[in-house]
Amino acid sequence: MPALILPLIEAAGHWPARGSLLGLDLGTKTIGVAVSDPDRRLATGIETVARKAFTADAQRLLALAAGRNACGFVLGLPLNMDGSEGPRVQSTRAFARNFARLTELPIGLWDERLSTAAVERELIANDVSRAKRAKIIDEHAAIYILQGALDRLATLNRAD
């Protein structure tokens, strides 16, 4: 059975109470990957996957998920600034649909507006060279996306 693809809050209802999540930042050339601790408090970068073909990319992501005992994915959804969905969102949703056929782990979609810009500003402020930024930007964007999702889930859990 294919994985569920849901907004983050709905997906959280399908994840167990504990367990790591993998955060994904889809780029055209790379996929940034981050992982949470099992208590879902902290996101850490683990890899930038150079995109090849969908099957190879998906196999690598599934191997990373298995190696970290992940129970789900958080996929950054690149909405336009006005909240509308453009071509990048359509591409991300297509990736999610294809990826969901290969796993049963629920996929939570999380608004990633400005994630790459925020990460780039932070890297520039820390005097990271342009060449180094190009290599690590997607992984750091995945950390930013996943940490934002974890913080939102923690806020909801405290409200319960």
Swiss-Prot record:
UniProt cross-references to PANTHER family, sorted A to Z: POLYNUCLEOTIDYL TRANSFERASE, RIBONUCLEASE H-LIKE SUPERFAMILY PROTEIN (PTHR33317:SF4)
Keyword set, alphabetical order: Cytoplasm, Hydrolase, Nuclease, Ribosome biogenesis
Annotated protein name in UniProt: Putative pre-16S rRNA nuclease
Known function: Could be a nuclease involved in processing of the 5'-end of pre-16S rRNA.
Claim: Hydrolase is one of the keywords in the record: yes
Class of enzymatic activity (EC top level): hydrolase
Any one Gene Ontology cellular component term annotated for this protein: cytosol
Pfam family, one: RuvX
Stated family: Belongs to the YqgF nuclease family.
Organism classification: Bacteria, Pseudomonadati, Pseudomonadota, Alphaproteobacteria, Hyphomicrobiales
